[in-house]
From Swiss-Prot:
Protein name stated in the entry: Galactose mutarotase
Protein role: Mutarotase that catalyzes the interconversion of beta-D-galactose and alpha-D-galactose during galactose metabolism. Beta-D-galactose is metabolized in the liver into glucose 1-phosphate, the primary metabolic fuel, by the action of four enzymes that constitute the Leloir pathway: GALM, GALK1 (galactokinase), GALT (galactose-1-phosphate uridylyltransferase) and GALE (UDP-galactose-4'-epimerase). Involved in the maintenance of the equilibrium between the beta- and alpha-anomers of galactose, therefore ensuring a sufficient supply of the alpha-anomer for GALK1.
Compartments, as annotated in UniProt: Cytoplasm
GO biological process, one term: galactose catabolic process via UDP-galactose, Leloir pathway
Major site of localization recorded for this protein: cytoplasm
Organism, scientific name: Pongo abelii
Protein family according to the UniProt entry: Belongs to the aldose epimerase family.
Quaternary structure and interacting proteins, as annotated: Monomer.
EC number: 5.1.3.3
Reactions this protein catalyses: alpha-D-galactose = beta-D-galactose; alpha-D-glucose = beta-D-glucose
GO cellular component: cytoplasm
PANTHER family recorded: ALDOSE-1-EPIMERASE, GALACTOSE MUTAROTASE
Length: 342
C-alpha cells in the first residue's frame, strides 16, 4: 500500500500562487511530484544492496523549474513533441502556433502544460492533477479539460492522462522525466543497457520532424529489440545519441515498451504503455550548465527519457495514428514505470 503526503514547495513570483509538493511512498519507491507542471522532482529506488538513490534529474527548489530548462520531469501538452512549422489544419481551418524551437513548435508552445499551476487532489495511493486549457491557449482550438493521475503500487509508478475537448483539437500528452539508474548526478548513461520493443522507427529531417517514412529497424542503429549497452552502441554506429520516435506494436491495450538495466546497481526500469510510440531521448542537448539537486551538473547524455506518445507531427501526417480529439470523445492513455532489481 502506498501513502501520500503534501507540503509547500514554493511560491510563484508576483502572487502567481503556491506550488505544493506531494510525496508518494511505497515499500519500494518514493516519488515527489509538484503541482507546477505535474512535475516529478525526485524518484528514489533501491539498488540490489538495498541502498536508495534518486534516479531522476531535476532541482531541489522551485526556482530551478522556473528558469529555462529542458522540461525536467514535467507533463507535456497540449501536444508533445514537434509540429512542423507550427501549423496544422482541423476540418479545413488552419491554426498557427508559436515557433519555440526553430522552425517548429515544440512541446505545447511557449507556455505549455509544463509551465502552469495544476489543481491537486490527494488520493489514497496517489495524486490527481487537473486543469482547463482555455480555447485558443498557445494557438490550439477548443477548451480542453485535462486530468493527470499518478498512483504508486509497490515498485510501479502509474501515470494516467485523460482529456475532453469542446471542439476538435490535437492532443498528445507525455511525461518528460530524465532518468539515470546509477543515480542522478552520475556523469553519463553509457553503462545502461536498453531494449525497445519496436520493429520500426520514424526517420527525421534536420529539424527533427518525421519525414513520413516508417522505417524498419532491422540492420540499423535503431534495432534495440535485443539489449544494447548505450556507450558501446553509440561508438559502434558513430551516433551522437538518440532523439527518435520508436513505433510500438499498435494496440490500445497495455503493452511492453522498453526495458533499461543498470548492471552495476542492479536497477531495472520497465515501461509499459497504451500509446503507439515512444520518444527515446538521450539528453543530447544537456550541456552541463544547469545546477541540479545536491550540486549535480547535467552534461550531455547524463539522463535518458522514454516519452510515451503518439507519433510526432501526427496532425500533419495522415498515415500516422490519429491525434485529433473530438467533442464527446475521451482521451485516455496510461503509462507504467516499473522499477525492480536484477
Amino acid at each position: 500500500m502506498a501513502s501520500a503526503t503534501r507540503a509547500v514547495f514554493g511560491e510563484l513570483p508576483s502572487g502567481g500562487g503556491t506550488v505544493e509538493k506531494f510525496q508518494l511512498q511505497s515499500d519500494l519507491l518514493r516519488v515527489d511530484i509538484i503541482s507546477w507542471g505535474c512535475t516529478i522532482t525526485a524518484l528514489e529506488v533501491k539498488d540490489r544492496q538495498g541502498r536508495s538513490s534518486d534516479v531522476v534529474l531535476g532541482f531541489a527548489e522551485l526556482e530551478g523549474y522556473l528558469q529555462k530548462q529542458p522540461y525536467f520531469g514535467a507533463v507535456i501538452g497540449r501536444v508533445a513533441n514537434r509540429i512542423a512549422k507550427g501549423t496544422f489544419k482541423v476540418d479545413g481551418k488552419e491554426y498557427h502556433l508559436a515557433i519555440n524551437k526553430e522552425p517548429n513548435s515544440l512541446h505545447g508552445g511557449v507556455r505549455g502544460f509544463d509551465k502552469v499551476l495544476w489543481t491537486p487532489r490527494v488520493l489514497s495511493n496517489g495524486i490527481q492533477f487537473s486543469r482547463i486549457s482555455p480555447d485558443g491557449e498557445e494557438g490550439y482550438p477548443g477548451e480542453l479539460k485535462v486530468w493527470v493521475t499518478y498512483t504508486l503500487d509497490g515498485g510501479e509508478l502509474v501515470v494516467n492522462y485523460r482529456a475532453q475537448a469542446s471542439q476538435a483539437t490535437p492532443v498528445n500528452l507525455t511525461n518528460h522525466s530524465y532518468f539515470n539508474l546509477a543515480g542522478q548526478g552520475s556523469p553519463n548513461i553509457y553503462d545502461h543497457e536498453v531494449t525497445i520493443e519496436a520493429d520500426t522507427y520514424l526517420p527525421v529531417d534536420e529539424t527533427l520532424i518525421p519525414t513520413g517514412e516508417v522505417a524498419p529497424v532491422q540492420g540499423t542503429a535503431f534495432d534495440l529489440r535485443k539489449p544494447v549497452e548505450l556507450g558501446k552502441h553509440l561508438q559502434d554506429f558513430h551516433l551522437n545519441g538518440f532523439d527518435h520516435n520508436f513505433c510500438l506494436k499498435g494496440s490500445k491495450e497495455k503493452h511492453f515498451c522498453a526495458r533499461v538495466h543498470h548492471a552495476a546497481s542492479g536497477r531495472v526500469l520497465e515501461v509499459y504503455t497504451t500509446q503507439p510510440g515512444v520518444q527515446f531521448y538521450m539528453g543530447n542537448f544537456l550541456d552541463g550548465t544547469l545546477k541540479g539537486k545536491n550540486g549535480a551538473v547535467y552534461p550531455k547524455h547524463s539522463g535518458f527519457c522514454l516519452e510515451t506518445q503518439n507519433w510526432p507531427d501526427a496532425v500533419n501526417q495522415p498515415r500516422f495514428p490519429p491525434v485529433l480529439l473530438r467533442p464527446g470523445e475521451e482521451y485516455d492513455h496510461t503509462t507504467w514505470f516499473k522499477f525492480s532489481v536484477a
